Amino acid sequence: MTEIKTILSQLVEASHAGTLKRYDKIGETKPYYGVPMGALSKIAKTYINQSDLFVPLWQTGILEAQYLAIQIVKNKPDQLVASDLKSSISKQVSHNILDKLASLILSKRRDSKDWEEYLLTQDQAIFQRLGWFLRAKYFARKTATDQEIEQTLTYIEEHLKTTDPLIQWIMK
């Protein structure tokens, strides 16, 4: 726990007025310290691949601590236990954080297809958006079968206009 306190102190010290102002302007999910991404990356290098820090950092609920948790484990996303990941996906978490989690962690895991299916079955639009993001990544890897592509295109054609705007952009 001392290590988490040290990390949080580093985040407080790295706070920047311009970043705080930007977060306020865009209505970012609080709490946050206003740490620029470059400073976060620099702090993350000290703790790289220490996956045991992911959960305690995430549980602080602090925006930059969650970004940092992602940065620390992004090179070895399969080290994270699925149950820890599942408990970190919450509608209270910043959409930007969840997007980063999907991009840098979920999409690079061996079980990313399972995450796609799980997220697409959730009621919350933000989770479905993450599921569609993972589906797009799957298609981009060119491993989808012709049948999967056809089924997805048919689904998009039938549902695009009535789908939550949060999901529409990814579907397009």
What are these regions (language model features)?
Residues 1-172:
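Alpha-helical scaffold domains
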